[in-house]
């Protein structure tokens, strides 16, 4: 009758050591090296019996544990001579000290990784919805024509750039670049011919980032020269661009 043995997967030798220490319910600051070493070697033997690849780092840790075990089994007098032979500090406190420090550091990182994983799971369970148009809930008397600030223009530009990202054309057609000065002339002509023009109408469908930025800078230059005025009739509505001094006539009823 066939049977299978399941072994826990470990990310490395320190992960395996922590598992054995937790399973044995021993103090990490006072590791019973002989007992843990036997369990560690037995686990590696099982991995090899199951024809699992045992990374070299597991073997290195096994050698480290055996070295610590041998030091702790030596009588104090012989240990003193052994340390002198290896030119080591005879006042070494505990051969387990370095291993304990590595285990504690690994345990901290493991706990942090687990916390981040839980936060990611929690965030994936949160769903947000897009912003709503709140203009129907604004009091009628607040729907006054106001001068548009640079902040309002930047917000409108960000929305256009976002739409450009979402609707990138499948093919790109090269166009002749237009200067800011030429774009200023085009905007003034559009305003004069129609009496006014909406902000969104200045940006044709499929406009490139360069064209969007050029148009935006042209608008700023025209506002700076006081050739045009930008107004907004209601909150969240499109920005209206008209000749300076005519904004009231062109925004009534919009």
From Swiss-Prot:
Give the record's GO biological process terms: cell division; chromosome segregation; DNA replication
One Pfam match = SMC_ScpA
Detail the disulphide connectivity of this chain as listed in its UniProt entry. none
Q: Which GO terms describe its cellular component?
A: cytoplasm
Keywords annotated in UniProt: Cell cycle, Cell division, Chromosome partition, Cytoplasm
Q: Where in the cell is it found?
A: Cytoplasm
Segments forming a coiled coil? none
Q: Does the keyword Lipid biosynthesis apply?
A: no
- Mitochondrion in keyword set: no
Task: Please tell me where this protein is predominantly located.
Answer: cytoplasm
| PANTHER family linked to this entry | SEGREGATION AND CONDENSATION PROTEIN A (PTHR33969:SF2)
Q: Which family does it belong to?
A: Belongs to the ScpA family.
Quaternary context: Component of a cohesin-like complex composed of ScpA, ScpB and the Smc homodimer, in which ScpA and ScpB bind to the head domain of Smc. The presence of the three proteins is required for the association of the complex with DNA.
Function, please? Participates in chromosomal partition during cell division. May act via the formation of a condensin-like complex containing Smc and ScpB that pull DNA away from mid-cell into both cell halves.
Q: What is this protein called?
A: Segregation and condensation protein A
Species name: Brevibacillus brevis (strain 47 / JCM 6285 / NBRC 100599)
